[in-house]
Amino acid sequence: MLKSGLVYSIGSANQFSFERGIRRFCFNCKIHTFDGTVGNPKVPTALRGLSFHSWNIASEPSNGSKVISKSPKETLAEVHGTPNVTLEVLKMDCEGCEFEVLPRLLELAPSKQVLVEIHRKKSFAALRGLLRFMRSHGYLIFHKERNSWGEPHSAVEYAFISIAHAYRVFRKELCGKAFTTAADE
């Protein structure tokens, strides 16, 4: 169980099962859900304290379109007053924006875990580039499964973990307090 933390959920389609699961696991986590495609979000009362933002996080901000988009840096500055935050979990299902947004967001706000649905809207070279980015920035895949909705192989769910975070958890949980340093806390 987590005592507290910061969680980002990008793309909700007005469904909050992910946020419910996080709330059961971490009652004091601050959860921010972003979705500019939902006009009137129906946030369940059990998720009080969840912050819903009616905008999309995009590689470039939008000015005149119907859907408001903000860059990762604008988002972090507006929500937290600073772009210097660390996320416990980043969940992304943004129908193709992951190729541009995920690298920019992780460079500004590293996350201990990343759950992302990767869509086949780009080439395999783009997918390979995104996976290389994740590895070069210290993330390993710990789970992967095909999303069975829609066209075959059109989306794959990936779960990444920060190598540094996994190491800290391993030392703390499996080796005990005797091997835990202040940096592990």
Q: Where does each model-flagged region fall?
A:
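Phosphate/nucleotide-binding beta-alpha loop and adjacent structural elements of enzyme active sites
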Residues: 1-185
